[in-house]
Design a protein with these regions (language model features):
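Long, charged N-terminal interaction/targeting segments
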Residues: 1-100
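Short functional micro-motifs and their immediate structural scaffolds
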Residues: 110-117, 146
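GST superfamily/GST-like fold recognition
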Residues: 147-152
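Short cysteine-rich clusters marking metal-coordination/redox-active sites
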Residues: 105-108, 138-141
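Short, glycine-/small-residue-rich phosphate/pyrophosphate-handling segment
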Residues: 103-104, 116
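Short cysteine/histidine-rich metal-coordination sites, predominantly Zn2+-binding motifs
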Residues: 119-130, 153-164
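Residues immediately within or flanking Cys/His clusters that coordinate Zn2+
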Residues: 102, 135
């Protein structure tokens, strides 16, 4: 059957466009490995165009944004707290297993790449240099990621919320 207004064509992948009203949700989605476009400088028009051009689901608490004609897929996020917002979105799409946890830059949304410790040694704090060996780098902003205390804290928070995270692969990094 061909697409109609009530049955638009299917999404190729679960990708999101997040607005300022649910900004912290973007970082949580990225933590799980979802492609979640967000930039605080984006206005409603830019978000709507991005969603239309890239086949993204718009997540917002702004009804006016979601009523824009260009938006094919959107969700009015009802929860007020970021973790509750995440669970609301995951429930909506029937997702409980994180697709690729700790694989994206929380700031840029870019997929992280493994980096040899020797190449970034000069950028590491002394204790990080001593205790950690697997690192990933954001090719866009240059941020370095590793499985430190923040990583463990986020795993615990997400697991306690019911999100299924695969066991860590030490060779893969965060």
């Amino acid at each position: 059957a061909s697409p109609t207004l009530l049955r638009p064509h299917a999404l190729e992948a679960l990708r999101f466009a997040v607005d300022e009203n649910v900004a912290k949700l973007a970082a949580l989605l990225r933590t799980l490995g979802f492609d979640a476009a967000y930039d605080r400088r984006f206005g409603d028009g830019r978000i709507a165009r991005l969603a239309a051009e890239e086949g993204r689901v718009v997540l917002s608490r702004d009804r006016a944004l979601l009523k824009r004609g260009e938006i094919v897929w959107g969700r009015l996020v009802r929860a007020a707290q970021p973790l509750d917002q995440l669970l609301e979105v995951l429930d909506l799409f029937g997702v409980r297993r994180a697709p690729a946890p700790f694989s994206r830059c929380l700031r840029c949304n870019v997929v992280l790449t493994p980096v040899d410790k020797r190449d970034i040694l000069h950028r590491l704090e002394p204790k990080t240099r001593l205790y950690y060996h697997a690192f990933r780098l954001c090719p866009s902003c240059g941020r370095i990621f590793w499985q430190g205390s923040h990583h463990e804290h986020m795993r615990r928070v997400l697991s306690e919320a019911g999100v299924i995270l695969p066991d860590d692969d030490p060779a893969a990094g965060p």
